[in-house]
Amino acid sequence: MNLDYLDFEQPIAELQAKIDELRRVGTSQEINLTEEVNKLEEKNAQLTRQIFSNLTAQQIVQLARHPLRPYTLDYIQRIFTDFNELHGDRHYSQASAIIGGLARLNGEPVMVIGHQKGRTTQEKIYRNFGMARPEGFRKALRLMKLAERFSIPVITLIDTPGAYPGIGAEERNQSEAIARNLFEMAQLKIPIICTIIGEGCSGGALAIGVGDRTLMLQYAYYSVISPEGCASILWKSAEKAGEAAEALGLTANRLYELGLIDEIIKEPLGGAHRDTDAMAEKLKKHLQANLTNLQAKSANDLLEERYRRWLSYGKD
């Protein structure tokens, strides 16, 4: 099994292996196999479109968790310039599961904040698997307040399996840190654009998710709980995660239908990890368009629209 491909993608992986083998044979034996390779590549593209046209909610969750999926730093490096990371919550510690700092988007100053996961074992431990402790949320709020002081817009990138549930986090008042962020973000007199780029799970996502616009990548998910957590509670078995994912309505299409997100950003064929540069360029265009629109509004209009927007959730 090719680990770069998920279980439902294995037919694609097998065809890609044949393409790679043909290329190797053509190169090593100096045979022109271009026509055969092109035919197989077209067949592979058709197969990929067929599989991805009918994904289940659980398969989308798998894509959101793909180990090669772009993380916050991948987008920062491609979308923004002059990024200057800011550290610490000024209360307890640095909190590496959330990163943030000043940057420029097409020359305009912005404050970028997002969850960061790791790729290697050491990075995953350092980033706490993208699960923020209270100091992470407090750091994020400190940076947002700093941005407000200088009238700089805030852009958040959400990608977390949830807030860290450890004893230490609870002792340092995890729930208060999340609630404080919700309260304060609702009142910031600057534009806030939130984008779910991967996992958007529970309070850990919402703690940097209160804004004027909520964007979502096509194969990300946004939910009050993970499918496995929901299945363990309702069915006493994580094996029911597929049913839970469907019931939670956590996909971008379903959330857009419910009016809980504003835009769905299409991903490259096969997911964002298949072409990170193209995905970043598309995200950049959406961020710039929304930022231009929001910057034309007064602070009072931003607050009024934000208030009405969040008050309307769940009414229909």
Curated annotation (Swiss-Prot):
This is Acetyl-coenzyme A carboxylase carboxyl transferase subunit alpha. It is found in: Cytoplasm. The gene is accA. Its EC number is 2.1.3.15. GO terms for biological process: fatty acid biosynthetic process; malonyl-CoA biosynthetic process. It holds the Pfam family ACCA. PANTHER family: ACETYL-COENZYME A CARBOXYLASE CARBOXYL TRANSFERASE SUBUNIT ALPHA, ACETYL-COENZYME A CARBOXYLASE CARBOXYL TRANSFERASE SUBUNIT ALPHA, CHLOROPLASTIC. Keywords: ATP-binding, Cytoplasm, Fatty acid biosynthesis, Fatty acid metabolism, Lipid biosynthesis, Lipid metabolism, Nucleotide-binding, Transferase. Gene3D superfamilies: 2-enoyl-CoA Hydratase, Chain A, domain 1. Acetyl-CoA carboxylase is a heterohexamer composed of biotin carboxyl carrier protein (AccB), biotin carboxylase (AccC) and two subunits each of ACCase subunit alpha (AccA) and ACCase subunit beta (AccD). Pathway: Lipid metabolism; malonyl-CoA biosynthesis; malonyl-CoA from acetyl-CoA: step 1/1. GO terms for molecular function: acetyl-CoA carboxylase activity; ATP binding; carboxyl- or carbamoyltransferase activity. One of its GO terms (cellular component) is acetyl-CoA carboxylase complex. Belongs to the AccA family. Disulfide bonds: none annotated. Component of the acetyl coenzyme A carboxylase (ACC) complex. First, biotin carboxylase catalyzes the carboxylation of biotin on its carrier protein (BCCP) and then the CO(2) group is transferred by the carboxyltransferase to acetyl-CoA to form malonyl-CoA. It catalyses: N(6)-carboxybiotinyl-L-lysyl-[protein] + acetyl-CoA = N(6)-biotinyl-L-lysyl-[protein] + malonyl-CoA. Residues 39-293 form the CoA carboxyltransferase C-terminal domain. SUPFAM superfamilies: ClpP/crotonase. The keyword Nucleotide-binding applies.
